[in-house]
Amino acid sequence: MPVIDLATTPLREFNRSLHNIQQGSNDLSYEVANPRGSHAVAVGIDGPVVVDVNGSVGYYCAGMNDGGTVTVHGSAGPGVAENMMSGKVVIEGDASQYAGATGRGGLLVIKGNAASRCGISMKGIDIVVHGNIGHMSAFMGQSGHLVVLGDAGDALGDSLYEAKLFVRGTVKSLGADCIEKEMRPEHLQKLAELLEKADVKDVRPEEFKRYGSARKLYNFNIDNADAY
């Protein structure tokens, strides 16, 4: 496994090597040392590459990931896994603002807490947070799943479309057009699958509540003007 030391290797050179892997290459696993909060680590992966980052990263780590597996053995700054298409990103620590923003697929696992706007405008990504999430999470979430083992901050699911939200702890407040919904068997089954994929132990799907869109803001209605 190649070891990339970002104290001596330019980040742009490392990212370029991830984009230029030849078909049939055996060098598909990388270990990254001394990230030291660098921005845009392992962005734009478009194949089955495995990247282990030993330390914390800055903005936009693993952005646009499409098929790779990126694990950060530390915490991540804003925008981790932004616009992810497929693959898996695991943050062993905490994640800052808008984790998983606009993600269209794949799985983002945050083993600590996530700050505000986690899953903003999510479009198919699955996000599992072992800890708590901040305010305005899943704002304008269109599809996908957000699973929170801890608590959720203010305005959860504001202006939500069809993303499904599962929270085990307390929700400080719900955003416009977001309501608690019935947990049906198909939701319990999907939740169990996501918990298993995210390596969550000793937690039952029945411990969660489901939240989703009331579908009252899909089309403008003057009677709902104050909710916009």
UniProtKB/Swiss-Prot annotation:
Range of residues in the leader sequence: none
GO molecular function: oxidoreductase activity
Highest taxon of source: Bacteria
Disulfide bonds: none
CDD domains, alphabetized: GXGXG
Pfam families, sorted: GXGXG (PF01493)
Stated family: Belongs to the FwdC/FmdC family.
UniProt protein name: Protein GlxC
Source organism of the structure: Rhizobium meliloti (strain 1021)
